[in-house]
Regions:
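Nucleotide/phosphate-binding catalytic cleft detector across ATP-hydrolyzing
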Residues: 1-93, 98-100, 110
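Short glycine-rich, Thr/Ser-proximal phosphate-binding strand/loop in the N-terminal lobe
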Residues: 105-115
Length: 115
């Protein structure tokens, strides 16, 4: 079995619900949860994602899966889903040769390449 490490990650986060005593922003809750999950590099959350946070977090009961993409310098949050979908993380590996193109489906969590 061949394995490969991708440039994206999906992580399930069970965030604490805001209270009068804990008034951290939604963004701060996510960044702290990512750090607790082992993401030590900088994470950028684009404005288009920030606009989706509160309605989605509230509907999801503060249990979400975030998708991160590595841009060569830092992680970028590219998607947010309700619940735990972290196991559903697939990608394509593409080899562009001089005469052929080979494409393989891979499980981005395990790195397993499906032949």
């Amino acid at each position: 079995m061949n394995t490969m490490r991708g440039l994206s990650r999906k992580l399930y986060l069970d965030l604490s619900v805001p209270t009068e005593e804990d008034q951290r922003s939604d963004q701060q809750r996510i960044l702290e949860a990512l750090s607790a999950e082992g993401v030590k590099e900088e994470v950028h959350i684009p404005v288009r994602m920030l606009r989706q946070l509160y309605p989605l977090l509230d509907r999801a009961g503060w249990k979400i899966t975030v998708s991160l993409s590595w841009n060569g310098e830092k992680w970028e949050l590219v998607d947010i889903e309700s619940g735990d979908t972290a196991r559903q993380h697939y990608g394509l590996a593409v080899d562009l040769g001089s005469t052929t193109v080979v494409v393989r489906l891979l499980d981005c969590n395990s790195g397993e390449i499906w032949e």
